[in-house]
Structures are given as structure tokens and as C-alpha cells.
Amino acid sequence: IQHKENVCKLQLDEHGVMIKIEVNMVGRGLIGGATKAPLCEAAQEQFDAFCAMPLVPLSQLYGGKICAALDRQHPRDLFDVKLLLDNEGFTEEIKRGLLFGLVSSNRPAFELLDPHLLDQRTAFENQFEGMSAIEFSYDQFEATRLQLIETVKTSLNESDKAFLLSLNGLKPDWSTYDFQEFPSVKWKLLNLQKFRQDNPEIYQQQIDALKGVLKQ
């Protein structure tokens, strides 16, 4: 048993079987109130156990999940995204959570909105296969990834695009999304200011790239 306190992870290894128990830490602040939710009925029945824990708002939960799916493109993230798209759908509230994730991320927004597609066959075979009772093939992974990218792009209206450009241009307009007091957003702005000061040409290239993606 290994307890990694700094990342809130418990790793169990017995007879060649490894189980990782992780708690997602929230350092960005909450865009809504947390709610306590019980373990789903299927898991309660499977493991004959019960627990309940506080969860971030659904919009932030899936907004962050979508940012992660666009960033690292891991099969587990895209599996969760497929379930979202097949059930709740990509709602306005989830879009709000996505935009919060975009302006809190260390990655440039244009890279998340128009990601370079990664070959994830090895990750799929070694880090996903056998984990889910619901069928999810590699072909479905690729189709879900393309669907997500298209869904995100088409969901952004002119106000959303103007907000992203204003923040990345270091003249944020908070009239649409009032994220100005969140520590992650303040940190993003500080990093952008330093980036513009230290590398003005590359900074402008990234602004132009964002404009290009938002015109697609």
C-alpha cells in the first residue's frame, strides 16, 4: 500500500493487481455550490458498500472533464464524454464550466479547441480495456473525440468567442462570465502578462492562432 498524500492518491498492489484510489483536488474554486452525492446503485450492489461525498457542480465536473479530454485525449476521459453526450448532452451550463476550464488551464486555449489528434491505441489497450462494463471500442473513441471537438466549436457563440479573445488579449470583459475573482483565472492572467512581456512575438502568434480557431 502506497499513500501519496501530496496528490491525494492511494495505490494498492496485491498479487499483481494494482488499484488506484484518487480524489480530484479542487484548487480553482467552485463556480457553484457543492452537493453531496451517494455512490451509484450499480456500484453499491457490485461491492456491497455505500459512501457519499461532496461533488463540484455538474457544469464544472464535466467542463473540467472536457478540457482534460481535449488536452490529453485519454480513453477514460473520452469514455466519460461519450456517456455525457449520449445522456445529459452538452448543455449551456456545461459550456460555462468548459469556458471556466479554458481560462484556468495552463494550456493555450487554441490548443484545446483545435487539438492535434493523438494515437492512443497503446493507452487504450493498457489503461482502459477491461475497466468498463459498457462497450467502448477504439473506433468509438476516435468518433467521440471528433464529435466532442465539433460540438465544442459549434457551441461557442459570438459572446463566448469575444470573452476568450478579451481574456487572452489581457483586456478581459467580465460582463458575460464573472470569473474574475477565481484564483486560477488570476493566475492565468498573471502568466499571460509575463508571457507577453518575455515573448511578445510568440504571444501574438498564439493570439492569432486563437482567432483562427474561433473563425472555423
Pin down the residues of each PLM region.
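Long, low-complexity C-terminal extensions of enzymes
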Residues: 129-216
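Short glycine-rich, low-complexity/disordered patches
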Residues: 1-2, 83, 162-167
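Catalytic cores of NTP-dependent nucleotidyl/adenyl transfer enzymes across multiple folds
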Residues: 3-135, 200-216
